[in-house]
Amino acid sequence: MTVYHFVGIKGTGMSSLAQILHDMKHTVQGSDYEKRFFTQTALEKRSISILPFDKNNVEEGQVIIAGNAFPDTHEEIVAAKELNIPVHRYHHFLGDLMSQYTSVAVTGAHGKTSTTGLLAHVMQGAHPTSYLIGDGTGHGVENSKYFVFEACEYRRHFLSYNPDYAIMTNIDFDHPDYFADINDVFSAFQEMALQVKKGIIACGDDEELQKIQAKVPVIFYGFGEDNDFQARNIQKRTDGTIFDVFVRNTYYDTFKITGYGNHSVLNALAVIALCHYENVDVEAVKHQLTTFEGVKRRFNEKPMGEQVIIDDYAHHPTEINATIEAARQKHPEREVVAVFQPHTFSRTEKFLDEFAESLSKADQVYLCDIFGSARENKGELTIEDLQKRIDGAELITDTTTDVLKKHKNGVLIFMGAGDIQKFEAAYVKEVQVAEK
């Protein structure tokens, strides 16, 4: 019996992949740091063993899958090589696995996790579908027809894949610790496009994506009239969004989605276009769109007294704009309060003015200290550099969250890719203690 051992099993992609293999009746275990991470809940539900790092975890007969964050000098990887056990990097293993199915890669600077989750949910309503989402969610079906997965452009990892289809949501400059500029990002997506085997579904409203060259058909979607799939007559409501879809200027159907903001319409359009191309029943698509409950850390909302709390992974100015827009659509009468933790010094420095501009669209802004990456030097930048660019912005720590109580009818949006949830948890605890 083959045992799949994951080095760094709590990573979002690694956790998802472990769940898929387990669901396909394989024996799975893994190791990681002992600090609790949100991805391990799904692993624990499946009774997948999570061990502390130890070279003795590695045994002959295992298949070793290593997370990209762990170097070849990691004790378990060294142990595997000493035993002549091949070590598969996450993205290479995933590339091999998907070749057995009709595979759909979802990529883009923003929106890929939400779009992957939505596509997986919609496809499941029509055909057996396995999926891997970048929020740590994975699901494997032994007799799958489709394999839907999130493909990240960071360090060009997505070039390990040769999918049948690719959805490209947008191209934007991010990860300044790796990419030099927007042209460098574009070159990565262009290289990816040439590896797609059947078709590309791309947002035609994105100027960079319009320049993509491919050996396969490129189907464009968006709001502009030149797109193959166009959303028209958009009704933005507090219970979701309704819009008509026109295919090459001919009315196709009317769809309702549970999401808010223009970005949610675009994500749904991408899914509708792919399903149309694959002849998925439109009634199944319409039904599944109305039952989608979202993905982890993307506009996750809960009421707390008179306030509403939203947890969101937004960590780039474009994403902050989208999240604030969505909050205003759903809660037009409420004050919008942004609690933001910048993620990495390199990103914060590169987009300092853009962060200030996007955050200023909230009614009030609170800033947490910058969450640095282990790979980078702090440099000269401080959170005060961002604060002074935003009128009325205040600094906040996990011990001073009680200041948020004054926003009695507020939507409190906790945004960031670091440990922003620590601040949210501190505030929830503060409110609960006060109520006793």
Swiss-Prot record:
Record keyword Cell wall biogenesis/degradation present: yes
UniProt binding sites for ATP: 108-114
Pfam families, per database record: Mur_ligase, Mur_ligase_C, Mur_ligase_M
EC number: 6.3.2.8
Subcellular locations according to the entry: Cytoplasm
Extent of the signal sequence: none
Swiss-Prot/TrEMBL catalytic activity: UDP-N-acetyl-alpha-D-muramate + L-alanine + ATP = UDP-N-acetyl-alpha-D-muramoyl-L-alanine + ADP + phosphate + H(+)
Listed GO CC annotations: cytoplasm
Record-annotated disulphide pairs: none
Pathway(s) per entry: Cell wall biogenesis; peptidoglycan biosynthesis
Gene Ontology biological process terms from the UniProt entry: cell division; cell wall organization; peptidoglycan biosynthetic process; regulation of cell shape
Keyword Transcription attributed: no
Primary residence: cytoplasm
GO terms assigned for molecular function: ATP binding; UDP-N-acetylmuramate-L-alanine ligase activity
Sorted UniProt keywords: ATP-binding, Cell cycle, Cell division, Cell shape, Cell wall biogenesis/degradation, Cytoplasm, Ligase, Nucleotide-binding, Peptidoglycan synthesis
HAMAP family: MurC
Main function: Cell wall formation.
Similarity-based family: Belongs to the MurCDEF family.
NCBIfam families: murC (TIGR01082)
Name of the protein in its database record: UDP-N-acetylmuramate--L-alanine ligase
Native species: Bacillus cereus (strain G9842)
